[in-house]
Amino acid sequence: MATTVVAPPGAVSDRANKRGGGPGGGGGGGGARGAEEESPPPLQAVLVADSFNRRFFPISKDQPRVLLPLANVALIDYTLEFLTATGVQETFVFCCWKAAQIKEHLQKSKWCRPTSLNVVRIITSELYRSLGDVLRDVDAKALVRSDFLLVYGDVVSNINVTRALEEHRLRRKLEKNVSVMTMIFKESSPSHPTRCHEDNVVVAVDSATNRILHFQKTQGLRRFSFPLSLFQGSGAGVEIRYDLLDCHISICSPQVAQLFTDNFDYQTRDDFVRGLLVNEEILGNQIHMHVTTREYGARVSNLHMYSAVCADVIRRWVYPLTPEANFTDSTAQSCTHSRHNIYRGPEVSLGHGSILEENVLLGSGTVIGSNCSITNSVIGPGCCIGDNVVLDRAYLWKGVQVASGAQIHQSLLCDHAEVKEQVTLKPHCVLTSQVVVGPNITLPEGSVISLHPPDAEEDEDDGQFSDDSGVNQAKEKAKLKGYNPAEVGVAGKGYLWKAADMNTEKEEELRQSLWGLTINEEEESETESERSMDSEELDSRAGSPQLDDIKVFQNEVLGTLQRGKEESISCDNLILEINSLKYAYNISLKEVMQVLSHVVLEFPLQQMDSPLEANRYCALLLPLLKAWSPVFRNYIKRAADHLEALAAIEEFFLEHEALGTCIAKVLMGFYQLEILAEETILSWFGQRDVTDKGRQLRKNQQLQRFIQWLKEAEEESSEDD
């Protein structure tokens, strides 16, 4: 199902004529010049108004990420203002999750007025599951006619892409359309607050042409491997850069959408970049980069980035996108600016003795009691703050009520949340819409409270991408289930997002996903972690056709390897068969690695009727690893791939505890066959966020001896260097 907001007839062409002086020009010789040099077509943009991940759950269970208010303005409004300011005249907004809310917001905004310089067309579908699906739809509908900008709806930027666009077009003109994408980066030190650890990248680039030669997410690693071929034969030299912030803004040729159609395993932009760099010699396509030093660009991928970008807006680093500029033309968002970055909306009341220290935004109609201390905080419209309240790096959305004596530190309170008397919120707490906490309670650091009970999440997962996916069922369950006063206070309303069987690891995982406190090997992206869905997201799709496809794909891979062993089929042909299965079942690269690792480790068990003891299992497995090592090396290339394979190996040995004693031999086999690198094995072994069983597995004496041997080998290698 798809809907489109149709622009006024001739709107794009009329506006293009106005910008270009109209048909025929305004003076003698205009027609001749037009004949000699055709003016570029109107600039288009593809705006993806969905992240295709759950990084903002449970906040985004109530409203989509692109409508979350940042400094009291919806995120998508920042993105559209950036696109319009940079010269975009037509934007296709693709929506999936909560599409009706996004559509309603846009239709009421200035972007859908006849006078808008940027014609916004809204396309909705419940079938989109990734950026790849969106771009395949762009190609199927033939929406883009020339180079276009590709952005997510949570990008905040003031970058003028004109120069980058000119460079991109010139490259394509001189090199016969070889360059298909220009990625925009901002020069930024690794310690900068707006550097999102999950998006940190190391880039190898041709010094003369800015052509990207290698692109790798750091995944928390400190050492990286680069193909030797990068440094051979490059006349101008190669730069290795770790001082870049990915703005998630890309200039794309129409070929990009076509390449996503041709490669169904491309789900994210990272998949696309990786695929093109790996196959550059075969496909002949190149990717370039443009680096800005003074302008601003960032993506709000988690609450850490939300806090950092919001602070930058308040501190005026994103000028001219400042709160008092009111670029949305909404009377409700008008405000004044004074010293120390204090912004006040209309009809704000400030009680006696209350202090607004610095970097504070007060929304319209907000009432603040006496003797309050507020610093580095944003308060939405219609909020009511009691007496003696302390707000430090607090983000309050519309209609929030905070009673007297409350203290809120580095936390987020969504629409119409209520904090009772004498409540303290430690850092990184989240109260979603209409939650009530208190009185006289302290919420520990990282507490997430929602009116949606966590155990209702699984019931909603089957329809998680539709507008009303089980919401009514969840509310009914909430009515039947009482709130826990120990968690939310005697007058509280809400559920601590901790199911009865959720262990400490999963609680930490929830905090990480919201605030991005630690490295998450997954995203990307998409989450922009963005390569593919993690195991939790796969679980959430129980009963979906995709899971059935993965099971069928696993059986097909098993059959392929069995036939390969029996008929001595070459590894090159096995790779071709696995690739054809991958395309047939629309399986992501990560899922291929998971399935391949699982199938090969299970293979000796599949061939025997009786249980195998550890030594016999190793004797059967290691020759298979040697025979199929080229297949593994074909799919395990990046550091993230190594860690995914190690996670699959760990999962196998946790499921088969009787074989646990031979994990060291298996890892040694992977290492000696150059499938897994020593630094990634050490990184995996040193992971702190593991289950009790995972910790027990790491206490295996043979495994610890192997790890010690690896460390000594690494130290000897470093000394030799």
From Swiss-Prot:
Any one cellular-component term (Gene Ontology): eukaryotic translation initiation factor 2B complex
Where in the chain is the Glycyl lysine isopeptide (Lys-Gly) (interchain with G-Cter in ubiquitin) cross-link?
61, 103, 141, 217
**Which regions are flagged for Basic and acidic residues bias?**
528-540
> Could you provide one GO biological process annotation from this protein's UniProt record?
cytoplasmic translational initiation
PTM comment: the record says: Phosphorylated at Ser-544 by DYRK2; this is required for subsequent phosphorylation by GSK3B. Phosphorylated on serine and threonine residues by GSK3B; phosphorylation inhibits its function.
Subunit structure of this entry? Answer: Component of the translation initiation factor 2B (eIF2B) complex which is a heterodecamer of two sets of five different subunits: alpha, beta, gamma, delta and epsilon. Subunits alpha, beta and delta comprise a regulatory subcomplex and subunits epsilon and gamma comprise a catalytic subcomplex. Within the complex, the hexameric regulatory complex resides at the center, with the two heterodimeric catalytic subcomplexes bound on opposite sides.
> Protein name, please?
Translation initiation factor eIF2B subunit epsilon
Quick one: which gene encodes this?
EIF2B5
